[in-house]
A protein has these predicted regions:
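S/T-rich, low-complexity, solvent-exposed segments of bacterial secretion/appendage proteins
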Residues: 1-349
Length: 349
């Protein structure tokens, strides 16, 4: 049998099963549900056709696993891993490639970036709806090392749709003067115009000799939302200001606050003393809905009554001084209070 190469058709790839060989792929929809750092990556799909190549499959797994290549951060290149596989030399570059006729996928550095691709990670459905499990189990050639910490949290797009995000930070360098971590961000809901990439951001975190956060080379995440009517990309900033680089037994990372929210409806509103009308929504969010404006006159006695508790500027009232409650000697507002009646009972009777 010939060894596979990048241009080999997927339907021609054979995998040994005991004393026989069987096709590793068949035409249909291939579903991939791998794991990284012990956490599920989410399910991505790849259409296997008669013209699909091994390189197409490699690109799919690399993108669906969130493996970030050296070129993604040109200013601060992503590091390769030290190669400790017996009989091999050179670094292990993150990504997918063919090694001695076998497929190999190298994750990014850090224990929580380690890929797990077993038999249960794949399902393929043919045109008739028959579902099978292809013989595509991957073993581990080198265990992942490197102190890591990860945090899973939810953000919301412009329609209030919840989006899962995972940020993993891995120790990259430590000197007498500083500690450097690299963070990687993944989102299974990332929907690029083409492809299945779940990687949505990366950058470096610098800490000084006292463990204090100094700076980040990048603090923004961008999640593509093609195929849905949400604003695309969904962009937000990570605040690393409360993260420290102190030495601990187990590194940890957590998202403590975010300013997005799920959809909500207006439940009630309140009026503040400054005239601000603030809405209270079912999702716990409060937002300013409007602003009351008041006016005062030099001669309020000259106001002309228009009925229904309404008055208009008169000839000798002077010009109105308008503003928010409490400004420029203007009266105040008491929320929830009832106005005293100014009805002339004697006249009305």
């Amino acid at each position: 049998k010939r060894q596979i190469n990048s241009s080999t058709m997927l339907t021609d790839v054979l995998k040994r099963d005991g004393l026989t060989y069987q096709n590793a792929f068949q035409i249909g929809t291939l579903s991939y549900s791998g794991r990284k750092g012990g956490r599920a990556l989410g399910t991505k799909e790849f259409e296997v056709t008669a013209t699909s190549t091994v390189q197409d499959f490699i690109d799919f797994i690399e993108a669906a696993s969130g493996i970030q290549s050296l070129q993604l951060d040109s200013q601060n290149p992503i590091l390769a891993s030290e190669n400790r596989i017996p009989g091999e030399t050179g670094d292990l570059v993150p990504g997918g490639y063919i090694q001695n006729g076998a497929l190999r996928f190298v994750s990014n550095t850090g224990e929580l970036s380690a890929l797990e691709i077993d038999l249960a990670a794949f399902r393929i459905e043919d045109a008739l709806g028959n579902v099978t499990t292809p013989n595509l189990g991957f073993g581990t050639s080198q265990e992942a090392v490197g102190q890591s910490a990860a945090s899973d949290f939810i953000v919301y797009d412009s329609l209030g749709v919840p989006i899962n995000v995972r940020v993993t930070a891995t120790l990259e360098k430590r000197t007498d003067e500083e500690t450097i971590y690299r963070w990687y961000a993944d989102s299974p809901e990332n929907q690029p115009l083409a492809g299945t990439d779940v990687a949505v951001g990366t950058g470096l975190l610098q800490f000084d000799g006292n463990g204090n956060f100094v700076t980040a080379t990048n603090d923004r995440i961008a999640i593509d939302r093609h195929g849905v009517p949400s604003v695309s990309p969904l962009q937000f900033t990570l605040d690393f200001g409360l993260v420290s680089g102190l030495a601990t037994q187990d590194a940890s990372l957590a998202a403590t606050r975010q300013d997005g929210s799920e959809p909500g409806v207006l439940n009630s509103f309140v009026v503040g003393e400054d005239g601000t009308i603030r809405g209270v929504f079912s999702n716990g969010v409060t937002r300013d809905l409007g602003q009351l404006q008041l006016a005062r006159f030099a001669n309020p006695v000259g106001l002309e009554a228009r009925g229904l508790n309404l008055f208009a500027k008169g000839i000798n009232t002077g010009l109105p001084v308008q503003g928010a409650p409490g400004e420029s000697g203007i009266g105040s507002v008491i929320g929830g209070a009832l106005e005293l009646s100014n009805t002339d009972i004697g006249k009305d009777l």
